[in-house]
Amino acid sequence: MDSTFLASLVSGAAAGTSTDVVFFPIDTLKTRLQAKGGFFHNGGYRGIYRGLGSAVVASAPGASLFFVTYDSMKQQLRPVMGRWTASEQLAEVLTHMLSSSLGEMSACLVRVPAEVIKQRTQTHHTNSSLQTLRLILRDPTGEGVVRGLYRGWWTTIMREIPFTCIQFPLYEYLKKKWAAYAEIERVSAWQGAVCGSLAGGIAAAATTPLDVLKTRMMLHERRVPMLHLARTLFREEGARVFFRGIGPRTMWISAGGAIFLGVYEAVHSLF
């Protein structure tokens, strides 16, 4: 097996699982803040580990898919981008944006069904991830099992691609600048964690409105067009609704970015 592929596979799995387990309670609080009816109506501080099962099951394969795609596409796209533009910095930014976007789309094949199950369990639609999955498989709304599991797919993609287009070029830029400043070839795991935290926090705050839309679509009883939902939310709850949960989301992803990318760098350095 190719060493780069194996390094990305194992590093991604370790990073994804550790981050989701540590920060799951904050994600639960964020989801309940964004859900219709508000925080306490959807469970408040009770059962903040509800839905953890689906998150853990999806963490390793989802993160592995992302990094395998991201790292392999970086190697393939960098020479291509270098031929398209004379600016080395622009070529690097475009490479990281495209590679991370393709990585996110791959990861969402696993992540979206897990998110649907997790968020419905977090907001007390059911008592466990397994019970939520069984309910979706019974297809009570008649929309179809696959449609039910992948509800909010495009909204998730529309949230994740802007997020990753901000996070990973910024993350790679900060790492490069830090390495140049310290006169080292590659940043250490803790330095990568700091860069990941800064990049993740900025990207999280900027994409909160898309995250709110994604959460509402996944929790809605039936499929609803995204623009229709956005207009309804604005009319009924005002513009502030699109920034609900920005604090927990930014805090969670900023701290999560430190662990996610710190663990990734630490494990990757072993190969």
Curated annotation (Swiss-Prot):
Keywords: Membrane, Mitochondrion, Mitochondrion inner membrane, Repeat, Transmembrane, Transmembrane helix, Transport. GO terms for molecular function: S-adenosyl-L-methionine transmembrane transporter activity. Belongs to the mitochondrial carrier (TC 2.A.29) family. SUPFAM superfamilies: Mitochondrial carrier (SSF103506). Solcar repeats lie at residues 3-76, 91-177, 187-270. The chain crosses the membrane at residues 6-26, 51-71, 97-117, 152-168, 193-213, 251-271. InterPro entries: Mit_carrier, Mitochondrial_sb/sol_carrier, Mt_carrier_dom_sf. PANTHER family: S-ADENOSYLMETHIONINE MITOCHONDRIAL CARRIER PROTEIN. It holds the Pfam family Mito_carr. This is Putative mitochondrial carrier protein PET8. It is found in: Mitochondrion inner membrane. One of its GO terms (cellular component) is mitochondrial inner membrane. PROSITE patterns: SOLCAR. It is a multi-pass membrane protein.
